[in-house]
């Protein structure tokens, strides 16, 4: 949705008919969609939750939260694979508690994430968890 949303809202000429919006949506889908939705899909005309009420950009915070969550959980998966235990690895849990939970809002969230994972978040774990990689 983000690319479509940015392209739609960066146009300098007003859109005068719905077919132009659907054509833009199809252009974006052709470029980035892993799976093409059915041709009858009219998402821009029906998904008012994201496109109305000033909420549009804030909606993407949900996907960002999924990226952080999946990447953090991947640390537990990696420990389980390395140690042959379950994902309830004590050492990884301790690092998570200290870097994320104990720090709370005392520092920027990215600093806490980096303290836990040793790097910035990536999308690989999310793609894997959602069956896309």
Residue ranges and their predicted role:
Residues 1-133:
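C-terminal, non-catalytic "cap/extension" segments appended to globular domains
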